[in-house]
């Protein structure tokens, strides 16, 4: 009962609490775009949504935000340490959703997990630059440095990887994956530029 109260229930509650679900929708669309059945990409879409939850829980702590989706942030209601742990669970769940999807062939699961791992790494790298520059009071950042940070922090996980993960499940060709990657990186970067 305590494990559920301190860990699983808060993550489930946060993930179900709203949001636009754009990233998992892009995953399903990526699958359909290459001729696949969207339902086959549900585990990848769920993995992307739980990553979003984990990233937002951690981001709220880093930014000292008070509200998320109109509600008190997880660290406000659960405490900082517990919230970090809840976010960490979300990060581990990312690969688990796909790993446990026995409806996908092993090679497809592996390829999707590789993309999801890339998504996690790039997003964390971008966040490290953003947080480090703010911490150090760096305002001498060149435009190309900002674009590198923004593409890593947002573009990979907001559009490029969701589209490619879905396309992998749908049996997309290397050319189709490359096209979705290019579109996704441009769309994700545009989202970050608008957000900033």
Language-model-detected regions and their locations in the chain:
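Mg2+-dependent prenyl diphosphate-binding active-site environment of isoprenoid biosynthetic enzymes
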Residues: 2-196
